[in-house]
Amino acid sequence: MKKFRFLYLVLTLVLAMSLFLTGCSTPAEEPAEEPVVEEPVAEEPAEEPAEEPELAYPERPINAVVGFGAGGPTDVIARGIVPILQEKVGEGIAITNTPGAASATAASNVLNTTPDGYTLFFGSEIMSVWQTMDTMDMHPTRDFIPVKLVAEATPVLAVPPNSPFNSAEELMEYAIANPGELTIGTAGPGTVPHISGLLCEQYLGAEFTFVPFLGGGPAITAVMGGQVDATIEMVQSMVEAHKGGNLKILASFTNEPIPGLDEVVPIGTVYDELSPYIPYGPYFGLFAAKGTPEEITDYLQRKMEESMADPRWDEYCENLYLTQIDYSGQEAIDYLEEWTSKAAWLLYDTGAAAKSPEEFGIERLDK
């Protein structure tokens, strides 16, 4: 019996100890989860803008074609700006004189080449009247891209040094009293010199016999040699001969004196009838054939701007009494359209035009 009680006591003690240990123990803590550290995502390098491919132009010499002979105003101005442009582009630029058909021959030659920027046209105001004068069906903004218009010039009336005329009034009075007797050398029909003479016929009653030459240079040579009685040409082409006593400039086709040439009388101060139509002078600029790639014409435009910013160009214009202009893009197009309208309708109104400007869609603008 004692044996069973002893066994019972042992079991009870074991059970009690078990319960005690269970009550005193705490549940084991679960291992803490380690924080998840996200690996930084490497940023992809930003794409750099693709470099524009280098323009492969010019890779050979460029030809700048002038539609009049050497020594005329277009040639003189081209020879002032083109050498500077040549430095800026780093390639040779040859000036080629191709006179004929009031520069339309040269322009046509340019249009018949590949429009790749290697054959350019250095043109002038005569481009605006080719259609009206029935010279050739070409238009300055339809067939060409005006890269840069650079200058305007002033026409002047000049006579040989031994001429009996010492003023514009004396010459006009003689031309009124003796119709057709006086010969006036010009660069050809439709040019500014020709139109200036027509204005004198239309509004002053004078009457001349116009003698066309293949450019202003030959016309000036003719007047200095006495082959014609007078010429109307750009001042920059005659100022040295005037100062040297080889011809006499009687008047400028302006309403104000030419700075530096105070002895030259503005014809608008003598004849009020001409005042509304002057100053009437030509423009000059560099043109590319339509179809020339835009990147090439843009390049040429930038290089022309650099050339015109060169102090040598400023000095050149000042010495030759040129008015600088700086037109390209739409501004040049608007200028050319306005000039074309003015010139074409003036020729038509004076009876010198072969065709009406209306045939070519040239609108008449207000004066």
What residues fall within each predicted segment?
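C-terminal lobe and pocket-closing loops
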Residues: 239-309, 358-367
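Mobile beta-alpha loop/short-helix "lid" or hinge segments that flank ligand
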Residues: 145-148, 272-279, 313-318, 322-323
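An extracytoplasmic/periplasmic, membrane-proximal ligand-sensing/linker region
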Residues: 59-61, 243, 298-367
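N-terminal (or domain-start) structured segment
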Residues: 25-26, 30-142, 181, 189, ...
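C-terminal motif of bacterial Sec signal peptides marking the signal peptidase cleavage site
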Residues: 19-23
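A ligand-binding cleft/hinge motif common to bilobed small-molecule-binding domains
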Residues: 125-136, 198-203, 230-265
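Hinge/capping helix and adjacent helix->loop/strand transition within the periplasmic-binding protein
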Residues: 85, 109-119, 131-218, 267, ...
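Bacterial N-terminal signal peptides that target proteins for export
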Residues: 1-10
